[in-house]
Amino acid sequence: MTGKSMKEAILDAAEKRVRHAGYSKMSFRDVAKDVGIKSASVHYHFPTKSDLGTALVERYKDHFSQKLLQIDTTNFADALAQFVQLYDAALVMDQSICLCAALGAESMGIEKQIRAETGDFFQVNIKWLQNLFRLHPTKATGLEATDIVASLEGAMLLASTTGHRTYFQKVSDRILHHTKI
């Protein structure tokens, strides 16, 4: 592997599989095949599927949090548009959905630790929006952080399931319309 550790390559392959087919369909054998190693080598880095799933969500949450920190919040409309763009990028990436949307859809059948980490991802997003609303109280009238996150995640699932990206676009346009009022 040039420039990337085997552990990162395994995480990349596992994330792609979860985002496309779901956590329950991801197997160590398939991930190993994607990376070009034996499944025992995947177990070396991640002894259990739960360990791999937890590491996936932690990494995804960290990357997303870093992107949130890069958003300049001095202009409410621009900041909200950049937030929505992060979700849009997750939908467009490999024509799949946000990792945590995929895991959230399977939440009743995944391990407790993965479910907790997935919930933490959503809380990071909600808290970021709440902070933005506190910075711009007159601009945020009528907006709720949980409504925005739930709407974007739901629209992502709907767009992915039906193949109609316009569903996501309609929801994001409605959210951003509030910045023009």
Predicted features along the sequence, with ranges:
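Amphipathic alpha-helical segments used for helix-helix packing
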Residues: 91-116
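Hydrophobic/aromatic-rich alpha-helical bundle segments in the mid-to-C-terminal region
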Residues: 112-123, 134-179
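Helix-turn-helix
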Residues: 6-9, 13-51, 55
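Short, basic, alpha-helical segments at the C-terminal edge of helix-turn-helix-like DNA-binding modules
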Residues: 58-64
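Short hydrophobic clusters on alpha-helical segments that form packing/core surfaces
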Residues: 10-18, 60, 87, 152
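Hydrophobic alpha-helical connector segments
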Residues: 55, 69-96, 145-148
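N-terminal intrinsically disordered/low-complexity leader segments
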Residues: 1-5
